């Protein structure tokens, strides 16, 4: 660290002057990499380990971080603190070595909490919509000249990164409930987009436990803080009397403090009116499709309005919103070989949604924006436990598309569960008589199988949270042609 950076750090976090070197185990994850980037730009020495390089590790290396693609005890011995992701087991050799050397080992949310401690923290929580809402808020604050620090779980396209160190007191961060680690955060403002049964292994399978954890998170707000909550969500509405903090509600509901009205979608843009208490109506053009994104925008507007940001800045940010990586991510429009003498093209969209509610929202946005296109989905279920727990919901939602291709379940380290795999899910959907799903044996087969069924004006949704995003990028790179298989065999 240079003298100027050290002086800045002593002003923001005086006690952290003892920390020089921060090591991240599992640094290639978006959440871990984002925090590492902010700390690197604050002047800390950053190192980390992961199993393989990716865009996150490449970006951090360019910032001066030392990245190891193995887990070894010697990687941590010079560290002041070791930050560990949820995916890392306690017997990881770097964790064992750090504990033996009496180096503090903390979770990523604890480090995020330290970044937030001396700033005006805005935490975005909820089962769905966190990443996009965080990006919208960051865009609005940047448009208003407030230069926020942000830490997001997905790529913020306008910034070209998951995280950025700003010069102001504002820190906008995605708050992760998957391991309950968001309880470490003590923000000034907290958004709750919705609450559904997901990551239930963390909550002992008890939905009441999950709901109480969200209440505990909101109780981390100071008495002068504010909770911004989606009143359209039945669970959020149920919890309102238990929050005990100042609340602003938002949604399509008539009793919302920030109400969405007259929503319509034209292609990739949503158009709607926002009614706010004691404020003029604003007519919003949002450069993101779907009613779910209108809700995300309403949450961001509620926070920005409370902060006193001008409507003109809010509206400019939303109409110019560039989106986030793998959230209805438009990868291109590609010409197809003529069918029956008619020219056609296929629109390729990559989406991270892996819960039935998220998949449903993506399908609805595609139908609303491109009603004349045939919806072709390549889907990869994520985790056997989620597939088992939400099996009927998945079968119902996936039956809405016109053509369905399905990869096997992305296990994320879980053992297979009989009856909760892709073959069973395809069979269930087929037996309902609406659709005849195509089981894709492996990722290498996907481009060729897609090419065989595309005709005319198709909209291809590549959907899921596993490694399916790599397939989407390969499809775009080769303009939907089935060259992936040969390239991978010979590359």
Curated annotation (Swiss-Prot):
<keyword id="KW-0963">Cytoplasm</keyword>
<comment type="function">
    <text>Cell wall formation.</text>
</comment>
<dbReference type="InterPro" id="IPR004101">
    <property type="entry name" value="Mur_ligase_C"/>
</dbReference>
<dbReference type="InterPro" id="IPR013221">
    <property type="entry name" value="Mur_ligase_cen"/>
</dbReference>
<dbReference type="Pfam" id="PF02875">
    <property type="entry name" value="Mur_ligase_C"/>
</dbReference>
<dbReference type="GO" id="GO:0005524">
    <property type="term" value="F:ATP binding"/>
</dbReference>
<dbReference type="GO" id="GO:0009252">
    <property type="term" value="P:peptidoglycan biosynthetic process"/>
</dbReference>
<dbReference type="InterPro" id="IPR005758">
    <property type="entry name" value="UDP-N-AcMur_Ala_ligase_MurC"/>
</dbReference>
<keyword id="KW-0573">Peptidoglycan synthesis</keyword>
<protein>
    <recommendedName>
        <fullName>UDP-N-acetylmuramate--L-alanine ligase</fullName>
        <ecNumber>6.3.2.8</ecNumber>
    </recommendedName>
</protein>
<dbReference type="GO" id="GO:0008360">
    <property type="term" value="P:regulation of cell shape"/>
</dbReference>
<dbReference type="Pfam" id="PF08245">
    <property type="entry name" value="Mur_ligase_M"/>
</dbReference>
<dbReference type="GO" id="GO:0005737">
    <property type="term" value="C:cytoplasm"/>
</dbReference>
<dbReference type="InterPro" id="IPR036615">
    <property type="entry name" value="Mur_ligase_C_dom_sf"/>
</dbReference>
<keyword id="KW-0067">ATP-binding</keyword>
<dbReference type="GO" id="GO:0051301">
    <property type="term" value="P:cell division"/>
</dbReference>
<dbReference type="InterPro" id="IPR036565">
    <property type="entry name" value="Mur-like_cat_sf"/>
</dbReference>
<dbReference type="InterPro" id="IPR000713">
    <property type="entry name" value="Mur_ligase_N"/>
</dbReference>
<dbReference type="GO" id="GO:0008763">
    <property type="term" value="F:UDP-N-acetylmuramate-L-alanine ligase activity"/>
</dbReference>
<keyword id="KW-0547">Nucleotide-binding</keyword>
<dbReference type="GO" id="GO:0071555">
    <property type="term" value="P:cell wall organization"/>
</dbReference>
<feature type="binding site">
    <location>
        <begin position="126"/>
        <end position="132"/>
    </location>
    <ligand>
        <name>ATP</name>
    </ligand>
</feature>
<keyword id="KW-0131">Cell cycle</keyword>
<comment type="pathway">
    <text>Cell wall biogenesis; peptidoglycan biosynthesis.</text>
</comment>
<keyword id="KW-0436">Ligase</keyword>
<keyword id="KW-0133">Cell shape</keyword>
<dbReference type="Pfam" id="PF01225">
    <property type="entry name" value="Mur_ligase"/>
</dbReference>
<keyword id="KW-0961">Cell wall biogenesis/degradation</keyword>
<dbReference type="InterPro" id="IPR050061">
    <property type="entry name" value="MurCDEF_pg_biosynth"/>
</dbReference>
<comment type="similarity">
    <text>Belongs to the MurCDEF family.</text>
</comment>
<keyword id="KW-0132">Cell division</keyword>
